[in-house]
Design a protein with these regions (language model features):
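Catalytic cores and adjacent flexible loops of soluble metabolic enzymes
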Residues: 1-313
């Protein structure tokens, strides 16, 4: 198997934010911290641990500040928090966070549904978000949701995404995150957008956030890596989706991405531990496991080293 995963392309597990937010169920602070620490101990390079969205609107995120407070500074160096306003950064930073994913949508209608303001208003606030980040010595990403399609307006033009990434008000963003929020993109579209962004926008670390709605989450992620993505997002068991994007389903499975790319730290023993962690969490949430790799790991093809020894489920 050719390993396309390089030292410059790492996985970020987004289970504790994008994975949980659509479930409607709030895991305890202690349980979230336990999951975060288990993932970090397994070798997952980076995590997304929560959102500063209002708890009454997105109940699974109601204890994000408590999760941040419970983690150590060293752990938080590998953990991102979703934010949509400068005030979100102030509050998360006061709890100890240093990495902020500032999200807005290429689609104005989705931005209004997801964040409650226009895309222009989100862009206008970005310089203040950068200043708040710099005050704590942190890092901020510019995350563009609905970079391919919108649940309300359909296909999003490449030029729309490029114009946002090129807006001088986004100066200070270390990363550019391009999101297939609905999971409707195909690999050639991912390649085209990443190529355009790298050629025509400021030099930033490129990140891909995909969903597996149409079964192309892994293929799209591999296309993004080949086109220069330095970090890619996944969620345990393919859990998740945007509550404000009708038609969106789960994220691309962390297990599937890791099996496809096989970074040096990802071994059959790590996969077995990850499958166990996922199964326990999904049972608590009453959610199915959508990971094909988890299914394969439980198969009876025991001569294959990635199959879990000791039985199937």
């Amino acid at each position: 198997m050719t390993n396309t995963y390089t030292a410059y392309s790492v996985l970020r597990d987004v289970t504790l934010r994008d994975g949980l937010q659509l479930t409607g169920k709030l895991l305890s602070t202690e349980r979230k911290v336990e999951i975060a620490r288990q993932l970090l101990a397994l070798g997952v390079p980076e995590l997304e641990i929560g959102s500063m969205a209002r708890g009454d609107l997105v109940p699974p995120m109601a204890n994000t500040l408590e999760v941040i407070t419970a983690l150590t500074p060293d752990e938080l160096d590998r953990c991102w928090v979703w934010v949509a306003t400068p005030r979100h950064i102030e509050k998360a930073a006061a709890a100890g966070a240093k990495k902020f994913q500032y999200c807005l949508s290429a689609s104005g209608k989705h931005n209004q549904a997801n964040i409650g303001r226009t895309t222009e208003a989100s862009l206008a606030a970005f310089p203040d978000a950068v200043r708040n980040t710099e005050r704590v010595g942190g890092t901020i990403e510019l995350c563009i949701a609905t970079a391919f399609t919108c649940p309300f307006d359909g296909e999003v033009p490449v030029e729309r995404v490029i114009s946002i990434a090129n807006d001088p008000r986004t100066d200070g963003a270390a990363d550019l995150v391009l999101c297939d929020t609905l999971g409707q993109a195909v690999p050639r579209q991912v390649t085209r957008l990443f190529d355009a962004a790298q050629r025509r926008t400021p030099q930033r670390r490129m990140v891909f956030h995909g969903h597996d709605t149409w079964g192309l989450g892994v293929a799209n992620t591999l296309a993004a890596i080949d086109a220069g993505a330095a970090m890619v997002d996944g969620s345990l068991g393919g859990l998740g989706g945007c509550p404000f994007a009708p038609g969106a389903s789960g994220n691309t499975s962390t297990e599937d991405l890791l099996f496809a790319t096989q970074p040096s730290w990802f071994t059959p023993n790590v996969l077995e531990s990850m499958v166990g962690l996922t199964d326990k969490m999904l049972a608590e949430l009453g959610e199915p496991n959508r990971s094909k790799s988890a299914q394969g790991a439980r198969s009876e093809a025991h001569v294959f080293p990635w199959v879990i020894r000791g039985g199937t489920q």
